[in-house]
Amino acid sequence: WDPYDGLNSKVFQALPFLKKSAICRLVVIQGFKRCPVNLRRLALVPKEYNAKGIGLFLSGYCNLYNAVKANPKLAESLGSPDSLKSRINELAELLISLQSKGYSGACWGYNFDWQARRLFLFPKFTPTVVASNFCATALMEAYEITREKRFLEIALSAAHFVINDLHRTEYKDGFLFSYSPLQ
């Protein structure tokens, strides 16, 4: 589960008058995040993969692999290079399967609806530049270890998402990219 996945609750989704209210969405998000008791089972929040989280785990496994290669004694506690490389391949494939579809290049979003401000809702899987950066960087790190060309190609294609799908706002002598294609 994720601290912000409360809007995936099947109970919440079954109540349209609640899910259409910006205030109710904020209350649910903050309630799930701050409640000392995990309400997710009771509220029927499914366990799902979060692409940004998988990207961070993939980066972590790449770091472990590099540490073991640099200091083979670490293999006793961290795993052999082969076992770590196998896990890197698994996580990279999972990450690739979690891409948001319909954009100019590889991109990733969160597996839940989330609200950035009181009146701005991002539907689940809306790609963001932040999640996409973590995921593309992790795939490049995986490529460095595995030499699986597809990992590099997919990672590099994220630049097409940034260049073609994100909005630009003029700022001083340049511009700023939006956080997502919706802004």
Q: Predicted regions span which residues?
A:
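Glycan-recognition and catalytic cores of secretory/periplasmic carbohydrate-active enzymes
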Residues: 1-183
